[in-house]
């Protein structure tokens, strides 16, 4: 039996790791595999209201529960897979799998919070029988930052994306670019704003990442007043439509473990402008406009280049083709195969 420790659904209301484990659980259920999903008190958008959830009651606050070893239910459990760097109780005799998503906390440390995160991640990795990394870049980061992990069986299994579709009239667009996700420092959101100051007929649509901060509003109102909007939390269908009609996705992040918006945009027929760094280069396979030493002028130049119909069509077609390499079913199927490899089957 497989145990999926669903602690991530209590740590996130939404987010990429939640989606990952939601899709994995959905596939396991569809494949009629015997499993148990341990779910703690949560308000997660993906976990609630789905038939495959089995609740596990705890009296501990989630801030303590997240660091605790997990009691194992059932004598026939042979695979334990935590959604966020936890280990089972020491008496567990089966195989332990850990998925490593990124090393953002190590690359951009935030004091004691990042130190605690790294200790837990390191312990989970070194206590595992098999490691799944969501990109080759993440695997290389793991081997560099935790050298002892080199001896642990490791596979790269890429993330998938949702059911995004391109529209029939490829190449047509409305005069806006889209920025998706978190906007903290290394995401280079301010650079995106500065780039649009150089192009006075293009709007900026921001999706997710929480409301604008006071500093962001000040910069937006100074550099591109009246040319920005925040879509907030929207459905996948609404996001798909925003991608379809956008001139481009701007994704200037300096570091990613994968970069799901890149593939979402490509699958939707939306060209991608991104920093030539970390995993984005790996997953885009030359279908994105990748920028070395990214800056506002280079972003602005890339946006302008996509006004050329032939060049835009080329990038859209390359992106759609590249996106076919990534699906949640493929991710989940490869994960179950890796379970069997670690079992020795």
Model-derived features: where do they sit?
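Carbohydrate transferase catalytic cores enriched for Leloir-type hexosyltransferases
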Residues: 1-345
